[in-house]
């Protein structure tokens, strides 16, 4: 009995199923060309100056620094670094997936994109743990208020993110396809078996575990504040806003991306029709900018976390605008004596 050979022979009679063994044509190039550059462009144009203002505000205006201030500053830095990778990806997808920046930059941009994505997730998790300790166990966790604890926690987050994402530099590379140099996404690379297990471990440790921690932290916080007889109404309102922002970030921005990335990789390993595989790929493409949309939510988070942040931002912007006006007046005066 030659059942495997007969199966392959029969499969070859149906182009869709024959293609499912790795020869499916990517029919989603128009979606990548028109959807990804536009969404990434909007995110960059809003997020980059927004996070630059946030960082300037935290460094020059926010005093004294608290543990939450240090975590938020690190979060803003990682969001800014994350956003710097978007112009390269915008150019890549807008040009029909033609990578012109070389193999090193391909690895670096893909690494930077994922490194800062997971740093952002872990900083949000770290912030949630600190909030939980301050509200639920204020006396036993008194030392967590010290900035030294926040500095150590942030250093640990950077190290974990680096260790988690550095294998990606070996799995991602630029390759020549149809006279074009392509910088492949993790799910489109060739080392499928290695990528499958790496992706599962990466997703479990740097997303699923933080998701559970953040959910438990904020459900406990809300339950405690709701049933607390002497809890200040302002504190309750602030906790609710933080809960909504954090859970929206994890369940709306990060969750669809990670679920569809797992499904996308599995679809390349399974014997399914090309039409189904392309539909899965299309859904995965749509989910990718959702992860970047988290940078919008973080801009709101900075305002909710600190009562003085909004005033400090206004002060920073006013100083910048007045400085530019003063410089313009000097230039105008020097040109017209």
UniProtKB/Swiss-Prot annotation:
GO terms for molecular function: G protein-coupled receptor activity; signaling receptor activity. The chain crosses the membrane at residues 35-55, 70-90, 117-137, 152-172, 202-222, 243-263, 285-305. Glycans are attached at residues 10, 23, 176, 179. Changing residue 114 to A: Markedly impairs itaconate- or alpha-ketoglutarate-induced intracellular calcium response. Residues 56-69, 138-151, 223-242, 306-337 are cytoplasmic. Changing residue 265 to A: Loss of itaconate-induced intracellular calcium response. CDD domains: 7tmA_OXGR1 (cd15375). One of its GO terms (biological process) is phospholipase C-activating G protein-coupled receptor signaling pathway. Residues 1-34, 91-116, 173-201, 264-284 are extracellular. Disulfide bonds join 106-183. Detected in kidney and, to a lower extent, in placenta. Not detected in brain tissues including the frontal cortex, caudate putamen, thalamus, hypothalamus, hippocampus or pons. Changing residue 121 to A: Markedly impairs itaconate- or alpha-ketoglutarate-induced intracellular calcium response. It is a multi-pass membrane protein. InterPro entries: GPCR_Rhodpsn (IPR000276), GPCR_Rhodpsn_7TM (IPR017452). The keyword Transmembrane helix applies. It is found in: Cell membrane. GO terms for cellular component: membrane; plasma membrane. Changing residue 93 to H: In CAON2; uncertain significance; loss of alpha-ketoglutarate-dependent G protein-coupled receptor activity at pH 5 and pH 7 when expressed in a heterologous system. Keywords: Cell membrane, Disease variant, Disulfide bond, G-protein coupled receptor, Glycoprotein, Immunity, Innate immunity, Membrane, Receptor, Transducer, Transmembrane, Transmembrane helix. Pfam families: 7tm_1. It is linked to Nephrolithiasis, calcium oxalate, 2, with nephrocalcinosis: A form of nephrolithiasis, a condition in which urinary supersaturation leads to calcium oxalate stone formation in the urinary system. CAON2 is an autosomal dominant form often resultings in nephrocalcinosis. G protein-coupled receptor for dicarboxylates and amino dicarboxylates. Receptor for itaconate, a metabolite produced by myeloid lineages. In the respiratory epithelium, couples the binding of itaconate to the activation of GNA11 and downstream intracellular Ca(2+) release, leading to mucocilliary clearance of airborne pathogens. Receptor for leukotriene E4 (LTE4) produced by mast cells upon allergic inflammation. Binds with high affinity to LTE4 and elicits mucin release from pulmonary epithelium in response to airborne fungi allergens. Regulates mucin-producing goblet cell homeostasis. Belongs to the G-protein coupled receptor 1 family. This is 2-oxoglutarate receptor 1. It comes from Homo sapiens.
């Amino acid at each position: 009995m030659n059942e495997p050979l007969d199966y392959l022979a029969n499969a070859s009679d149906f182009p869709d199923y024959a293609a499912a063994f790795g020869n499916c044509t990517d029919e989603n190039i128009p979606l990548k060309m028109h959807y990804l550059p536009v969404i990434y462009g909007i995110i960059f144009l809003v997020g980059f100056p927004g996070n630059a203002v946030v960082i300037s505000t935290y460094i020059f205006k926010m005093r004294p620094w608290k543990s939450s201030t240090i975590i938020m500053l690190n979060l803003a830095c990682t969001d800014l670094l994350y956003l710097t990778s978007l112009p390269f990806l915008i150019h890549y997808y807008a040009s029909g997936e033609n990578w012109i920046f070389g193999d090193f930059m391909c690895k670096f941009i893909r690494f930077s994109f994922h490194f800062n994505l997971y740093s952002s997730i872990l900083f949000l998790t770290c912030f949630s743990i600190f909030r939980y300790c301050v509200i639920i166990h204020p006396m036993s966790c008194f030392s967590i208020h010290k900035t030294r604890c926040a500095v150590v926690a942030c250093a640990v987050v950077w190290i974990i993110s680096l260790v988690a994402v550095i294998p990606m530099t070996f799995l991602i590379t630029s390759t020549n396809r149809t006279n074009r140099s392509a910088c492949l996404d993790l799910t489109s690379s060739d080392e499928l078996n290695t990528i499958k297990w790496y992706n599962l471990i990466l997703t479990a440790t740097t997303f699923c575990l933080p998701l559970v921690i953040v959910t438990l932290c904020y459900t406990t916080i809300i339950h405690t504040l709701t049933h607390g007889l002497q809890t200040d109404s302002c504190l309750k309102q602030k906790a609710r806003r933080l809960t909504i922002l954090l859970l929206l970030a994890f369940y709306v921005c990060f969750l669809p991306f990670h679920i569809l990335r797992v499904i996308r990789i599995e679809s390349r390993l399974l014997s399914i029709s090309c039409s189904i595989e392309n539909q899965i790929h299309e859904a995965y493409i749509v989910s990718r900018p959702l992860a970047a949309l988290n940078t919008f939510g973080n801009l709101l988070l900075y305002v909710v976390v600190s009562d003085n942040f909004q005033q400090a931002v206004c002060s920073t912007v006013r100083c910048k605008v007045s400085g530019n006006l003063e410089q313009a007046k000097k230039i105008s005066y020097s040109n017209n004596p």
